[in-house]
Curated annotation (Swiss-Prot):
Family: Belongs to the LeuD family. LeuD type 2 subfamily.
Gene3D superfamilies from the UniProt entry: Aconitase, domain 4 (3.20.19.10)
Protein name: 3-isopropylmalate dehydratase small subunit
Catalytic activity: (2R,3S)-3-isopropylmalate = (2S)-2-isopropylmalate
Pathway info: Amino-acid biosynthesis; L-leucine biosynthesis; L-leucine from 3-methyl-2-oxobutanoate: step 2/4
UniProt KW keywords: Amino-acid biosynthesis, Branched-chain amino acid biosynthesis, Leucine biosynthesis, Lyase
BP-aspect Gene Ontology terms: L-leucine biosynthetic process
Originating organism: Saccharolobus islandicus (strain M.14.25 / Kamchatka #1)
Assembly, per entry: Heterodimer of LeuC and LeuD.
Lineage of the organism: Archaea, Thermoproteota, Thermoprotei, Sulfolobales, Sulfolobaceae
Summary of the function given for this chain in its UniProt record: Catalyzes the isomerization between 2-isopropylmalate and 3-isopropylmalate, via the formation of 2-isopropylmaleate.
Keyword Zinc-finger listed: no
């Protein structure tokens, strides 16, 4: 699974209240949530992300309260993947379950510049930036299968169909 696109960069400790503020949690429409993704840091994020971007961030991306809407909002906004030094565990699972690839890369914010164009091999974790290859932690096994299906619901539907035959 290869993903590529331009980079939008954020720092450390981007919590779920920043990814999607609590006042929008009563809404369920992914496109509505997308319009408010990252709003506290960048009110124009939705417009920038709409063409398809890769977020590069620092430590503990997705920390804070558990909210599935954070991954939903990012994906619906046009985020193709998130590369970070580390992720909050619950955000990591929510991202996979919603079909949003998340790659752990040491020193991600030092290695990749804003507006760089990156190409990511999700399975191996290799990230091509210009002529430099960085080695992140790839996604394998069932998590990769869930991503390839487009998320946990699509994966379960696929498994149900396979089991019927």
């Amino acid at each position: 699974m290869i993903i590529e696109g331009p980079v939008i960069k954020f720092g450390d400790k981007i919590d779920t209240d920043i990814i999607i503020p609590a006042r929008y949690l009563k809404y369920t429409d992914p496109q509505y949530l997308a319009q408010h993704a990252m709003e506290p840091l960048d009110p124009e994020f939705y417009k920038k992300a709409s063409k398809g971007v890769i977020i590069v961030a620092g430590k503990v991306f997705g920390m804070g309260s558990s909210r599935e809407q954070a991954a939903i909002a990012l994906k619906a906004a046009g985020v193709k993947a998130v590369v970070a030094e580390s992720f909050a565990r619950i955000f990591y699972r929510n991202a996979i379950n919603n079909g949003l690839p998340v790659i752990t890369l040491p020193n991600s914010t030092k290695e990749i510049d804003e507006n760089s164009y990156v190409k990511i091999d999700v399975e191996t974790g290799e990230i091509l930036v210009g002529n430099k290859v960085l080695k992140g932690k790839g996604i394998t096994g069932m998590a990769l299968e869930i991503l390839q299906a487009g998320g946990i619901m699509e994966y379960l539907k696929k498994m149900q169909t396979v089991n019927r035959n």
